[in-house]
Amino acid sequence: MCPPDHFTVEYAINPWMDITVEVDASLALKQWDMLRTTLADLGHTVHVLDPEPGLPDMVYAANGAFSVDGTVYGAQFRHPQRAAEALAHRGFYTGGGWDFASPVHVNEGEGDFAYLPAAYGGMVLAGYGFRTDPAAHAEAQEVLRRPVLSLKLVDPAFYHLDTALAVLDDRHIAYYPGAFSPASQRVLAQLFPDAVIADRQDAEAFGLNLVSDGRHVVLNTEAVAMGDKVRAAGYLPVHVELTELKRGGGSVKCAVAELRR
């Protein structure tokens, strides 16, 4: 995670960003810290990346890389405003002894990649359409040595995979079908017939932008209906307020890069 010390909305690179609305910086930091504390209280180790001036979106730490079994596929951001974030993330991983692969193609880390270690022998789901170059999917497959399934995003409101699809445990997902092309919807329905299906209201509340450890599902307080759905599926929803981070187009998952070693 990376604290929102420099978080503000000073440019608009997704439909949720409104440069005319001022961010409450102290509230953003308070809410972020509550998310960090919640994850720690659930038994997880939280590493904190130092924020850098001039990079207001570094708080969305999930976008900086994607890791599987000790190997890290680095990010290359679509928009120049975020480009320098990739170097900060690379420094974290290389300094920590991870096997780091620098990308050739544009990709935005866990924003557009998700891993299911027990599904079909270990599968990566990968989104494209708005941020990540489809060629990055093949590149990630070579780096990570896992099959990568490409899914086309078609609604600009859900510009990253992690706004439209969430991993609930090692083999199960939740997703909003309307965010995907008809072909991708059919693929998801075939591969994950027991998925938790979200509706547009769930997705617009960033209810799919969640973090799950296989039992506890951490999601924002606006996603009440999504919390009810994951509870009905056998998980324990844990709600955290993240109203300020939503102003930049992100929520729980955007703020958390999961480390898989």
Task: Outline where the language-model segments fall.
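The feature marks the mature, well-folded catalytic cores of soluble enzymes
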Residues: 1-261
